[in-house]
Amino acid sequence: MQKYISEARLLLALAIPVILAQIAQTAMGFVDTVMAGGYSATDMAAVAIGTSIWLPAILFGHGLLLALTPVIAQLNGSGRRERIAHQVRQGFWLAGFVSVLIMLVLWNAGYIIRSMENIDPALADKAVGYLRALLWGAPGYLFFQVARNQCEGLAKTKPGMVMGFIGLLVNIPVNYIFIYGHFGMPELGGVGCGVATAAVYWVMFLAMVSYIKRARSMRDIRNEKGTAKPDPAVMKRLIQLGLPIALALFFEVTLFAVVALLVSPLGIVDVAGHQIALNFSSLMFVLPMSLAAAVTIRVGYRLGQGSTLDAQTAARTGLMVGVCMATLTAIFTVSLREQIALLYNDNPEVVTLAAHLMLLAAVYQISDSIQVIGSGILRGYKDTRSIFYITFTAYWVLGLPSGYILALTDLVVEPMGPAGFWIGFIIGLTSAAIMMMLRMRFLQRLPSAIILQRASR
């Protein structure tokens, strides 16, 4: 029992800074929305539309680079720290290549925006302008993620938290300058949010690099002799590990976007109630997601040390802590669902629907916690391909179709509206949790030599 308590302390010490970093990131988006809304409703809508296109694109690159964390953790655990610098340099090359592709996609996203049904031309122009300003921050964001993954792979999660809050503090005044045109800068409105956010990502990257150069604990790995050229073998391996994670993230983000589109014709009350419940659920999701990042680090480190039993302990402890957290957040959601809904909107119909949907959200929080921590465990074992297959099957083969049938058709019951989609979420997330656990159990039953061989690739 003592080993699980000790492991839980280590996991929480890693996870809490990740939680705070994620809160800072979420707050940046909130600040952009509020400050753009203070300028005009059109500018706020433009930022919302631009963000809905930016997120799937940049999260794809983010997911690709998540492969670095277990690779570095495993090298650190095995005492092969001299190889970490080369992996990081190749991560920067990969981030550079991917950022160019993302920038090209975002530059041409105007075709998507202007093809939206009944969109106001002025709104479309502002959304395109916002994206074309923001896309210059894509390299800065991805380079920052490489540096952050280096730190987190070495079990140092506090730097990412500090840089997140530095970014938030810089974002507010820079937003103000570019939205309203102060200190000789042009008055850009919502487009100014894109300029500010792009600048902030570069500030965060440069601040993180400055920290790494000065950190004594990383002095032995930050210098590499000669100029590091692209290494096709290393980059191929990073892509093999990262692409399934990137696709899984992409499928998850697009799932919720598709559901939002399917709910939109049902009316203002249904859309508002759905959005409130989804927004609150996303806030609660930060807890297991951050714990999953910590579990990836611990499992990778233990496998690097050659101890499959300690890796199992880290995995099981992560799941137990995650289930406890989810139980508490579910109780909190059920107990205060109406008060929470009132924080967003005071329309009685909207509050009633949102409170009802939050009951369903409380049901799936435990499944959601298990599936996301399970994904973190599999990343630690470098078994990322199975994450893609499980995510795609659970969300797009089981969850979305069942939600659509329940919400919009009478094949099973009378059309349930948004609640049908939320039952679909429960089906999808529970299926993902079951499949993640089965895969984890399969991996942990393999002979230790095979597990360690797979982890060292």
UniProtKB/Swiss-Prot annotation:
Cytoplasmic face of the membrane: 1-10, 74-92, 148-159, 210-242, 297-313, 371-386, 439-457
GO CC list: membrane; plasma membrane
Periplasmic compartment residues: 32-52, 114-126, 181-188, 264-275, 335-349, 408-417
Protein name: Multidrug resistance protein MdtK
Gene Ontology MF annotations: antiporter activity; dipeptide transmembrane transporter activity; xenobiotic transmembrane transporter activity
Gene Ontology biological process terms, A to Z: cellular response to reactive oxygen species; dipeptide transmembrane transport; protein transport; response to antibiotic; sodium ion transport; xenobiotic detoxification by transmembrane export across the plasma membrane; xenobiotic transmembrane transport
Presence of keyword Cell cycle: no
Organism: Escherichia coli (strain K12)
Membrane topology: Multi-pass membrane protein
Domain of life: Bacteria
Family under the similarity heading: Belongs to the multi antimicrobial extrusion (MATE) (TC 2.A.66.1) family. MdtK subfamily.
InterPro entries: MATE_fam (IPR002528), MATE_MdtK (IPR050222), MdtK-like (IPR048279), Multidrug-R_MdtK (IPR022913)
Pfam families: MatE (PF01554)
Record field: transmembrane: 11-31, 53-73, 93-113, 127-147, 160-180, 189-209, 243-263, 276-296, 314-334, 350-370, 387-407, 418-438
Subcellular location: Cell inner membrane
Key words, A-Z: Antibiotic resistance, Antiport, Cell inner membrane, Cell membrane, Ion transport, Membrane, Peptide transport, Protein transport, Sodium, Sodium transport, Transmembrane, Transmembrane helix, Transport
Role according to the record: Multidrug efflux pump that probably functions as a Na(+)/drug antiporter. Confers resistance to many drugs such as fluoroquinolones (norfloxacin, ciprofloxacin, enoxacin) and tetraphenylphosphonium ion (TPP). Also to deoxycholate, doxorubicin, trimethoprim, chloramphenicol, fosfomycin, ethidium bromide and benzalkonium. Also able to export peptides; when overexpressed, allows cells deleted for multiple peptidases (pepA, pepB, pepD and pepN) to grow in the presence of dipeptides Ala-Gln or Gly-Tyr which otherwise inhibit growth.
Primary residence: membrane
The keyword GTP-binding is annotated on this UniProt entry: no
